[in-house]
Amino acid sequence: MSLQSLLYEMHGYRVKPMTREEIVQVALPIAKYLKFTEWHKQRSKFEWILETLNEIVNIEIFSEQEWNELTKGLTQAHYSPNELTIRTTEKTYQLACQGDRDALGIILHELGHMFLMHQTYLHKSNEPPTINENPEWQADTFAEVILESMGYQTKQLSLNFESPEM
């Protein structure tokens, strides 16, 4: 059992393990194909790019009120593999069309679930799960890789607010 396994607690289901490098090998060709790349970083094109996604995946857009009734505000978007459908709010979709990094990250995260082929399976293992088996980490990594290829900053600052010892 690795230290990583001891420190890591996963919520939800397991998927096929993938390293960051394996996710990059999936994400970058998809980003290029869908024209999610730095040289296409023109806000006017994002709406067109997101509209062309409808050829690959259904996108259902809900009003904020409908979404809150449906999800109780627990999530900003959802991907259903059985229906090949991404569901999100009108606000998130519109912000993504305008090139908002956080909104694009939400849509790309859900696309990550689709392109990384996340399915819920029954799974029995005597080994504790690792982060590489976490579908949320994988989808976050997929989104991060594409956002970086588009020229967005994804690394967050870590600030230490603890008072220095005297």
Name each model feature, range by range.
Residues 1-166:
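Active-site hotspot residues in diverse enzymes, especially metal/ion-binding acidic/histidine motifs
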